[in-house]
Amino acid sequence: NSGCNGGNRLLTWQYYQKSGIVSDSCYPYTAGKGNVEACRTACVSGEAWKKYKATNVKTLSNPTQIKNALMEGGPIHTGFTVYDDFMEYSGGIYEYVSGSSLGGHAVVIVGWGVEAGTSYWIVQNSWGPEWGENGYFIIKEGECSFDTYAVTGNPVV
């Protein structure tokens, strides 16, 4: 919604529901250094510009709701507060230890688990496969406001 200045997960999903979005092969995500290119109106792949919409968009505000939604429909869109120490993550269950807040960051929850009595989320990041654990990380349940405002919906194909 606001480019490099952040956005709102629910508004993003409501746009997806009302206006639709194109496929990743049509308009692939490109990581950058904060420069936002003009929006395209044609697919880079040469395929037809077809928009897909979503239904049943809803917010989830606790771990039980998120786990149920994962089992019912797949990945969940969420965000959390990123701190300095998260930038050094390379594996294991992340727990905030120290550092300043760097702002919010949107990610996708793909699963959960428990290790030595600690509940955690398995998460796909958008920083590429060289970061974290092949582009994924594990974060302690409840850490950094992680599971208090997630959004899900069902794609219409």
Model-predicted regions and their roles:
Residues N1-V157:
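Catalytic-core signature of thiol
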